[in-house]
Amino acid sequence: MAMATSFYCSTAIPSKKTNQNRENFLCSPVGGSKTTPSYIRLSTRQSRTLSLVVSAAASGAAVEAEPKFAAVTPSKILSFRVGHGFDLHRLEPGYPLIIGGINIPHDRGCEAHSDGDVLLHCVVDAILGALGLPDIGQIFPDTDPKWKGAPSSVFIKEAVRLMDEAGYELGNLDATLILQRPKVSPHKEAIRQNLCQLLGADPCVVNLKAKTHEKVDSLGENRSIAAHTVVLLMRK
């Protein structure tokens, strides 16, 4: 019997082919998607039959694969899911500055299609990301006039509904605001409490931090505001 050795392992290779206990796997979009394929376990006989079907189809013959080959393995349900969200908006005179649903006094605010709440937007994206769903811009496109000037609490409530529908609850949330001015510390607790209320979460699982950008680039020059959020979702 010939032996093949690699850096990782040593595997015995039989001198002749054998069909004993042979299994084949077919990657198919049935029950999955183009980006998340499902795997179908085929016996040797089924594999040969399917090869004939594919060959016949390639030659132009009208042949249909039997449905019994489309049995798929159910998706694994995860106990925990982690998501990250990021958002940034320009700061312009004449707009309100709303952070976490709280109106913050300032000489400029966020220019955006909705109310421009950078914190709530990135929280929504973090939840959607953890659930493996499209981002906030796809679910609430800025090309849709019905979201013009909409309060971001609408987006948060929809994200919470989707989370609940998927069978998950918030384990914890950690958010970071990045802006040069104004100082967030006088308003931080009000922002956090409102965020907890919108999420239906205990305050002990929601954390909020604020950082300046050391007067570097648009964030440090009071021309923009940004936020990052990480969430942990737990299976109910």
From Swiss-Prot:
UniProt EC number: 4.6.1.12
Keywords assigned by UniProt, alphabetized: Chloroplast, Isoprene biosynthesis, Lyase, Metal-binding, Plastid, Transit peptide
Main location (coarse class): plastid
Ranges in a coiled coil: none
First-level EC class: lyase
Transit pept. (range): 1-55
Cofactor: a divalent metal cation
Protein name as catalogued: 2-C-methyl-D-erythritol 2,4-cyclodiphosphate synthase, chloroplastic
Positions of the record's site feature: Transition state stabilizer: 113, 212
